Amino acid sequence: MTDSTHPTPSARPPRQPRTGTTGTGARKAGSKSGRSRAREFALQALYQHLVGGNDATAIDVFTRDLSGFHKADAAHYDALLHGCITTAQYMDELIAPQLDRKMSEISPIEHAVMWIGVYEFQHCQDVPWRVVINECIELAKEFGGTDGHKYVNGVLNGLAPQLRATEVAADKAAARG
């Protein structure tokens, strides 16, 4: 028996599953662009370089044989892998002042993701700075530790005004109205 003055709350409709994302909120493979896939493969290759000290050529041969590589933007992958390895010391010098710990204490996944972000800030001017950060956050969510994406976000947000000064300033001015 229900009281007519207090109607029973209507049941919520069943929650609709989010399409295009994994349980961590990262995008599913089917909804990723060729560049996003290239970043994933570059991350895996850079991880091998950081952890195993493997040569870029050997890593490249191995990575190109992985399932799904044919869907990646191979030119972007090449630029990321070889560009990050070639400029690693310089990128670490840019990243280090943003860290709250020694570089050696940073997870190799987060380290590689930050390299990708710094490289794209410097060499991929066609990719907006916010997109660079968002793509790196997605990589850290999918491959990194529990809160690694927050750390990557903080570091890259700290570097963006330095590496993309004009673009960041224009965005902030536009946001102020």
Curated annotation (Swiss-Prot):
Q: Where is this region: Disordered?
A: 1-35
Q: Which GO terms describe its cellular component?
A: cytosol
Query: Does this entry carry the keyword Transcription?
Result: yes
- Do you know which Pfam families this protein is assigned to? NusB
Mind listing the UniProt keywords for this protein, alphabetically?
A: RNA-binding, Transcription, Transcription antitermination, Transcription regulation
Residue ranges with Low complexity bias: 17-28
Q: Name one GO biological process term.
A: DNA-templated transcription termination
Q: Which InterPro entries match?
A: NusB-like_sf, NusB_fam, NusB_RsmB_TIM44
Q: Which GO terms describe its molecular function?
A: RNA binding
NCBIfam families per record: nusB
The UniProt similarity line reads:
Belongs to the NusB family.
Q: What is this protein called?
A: Transcription antitermination protein NusB
- Gene name linked to the record: nusB
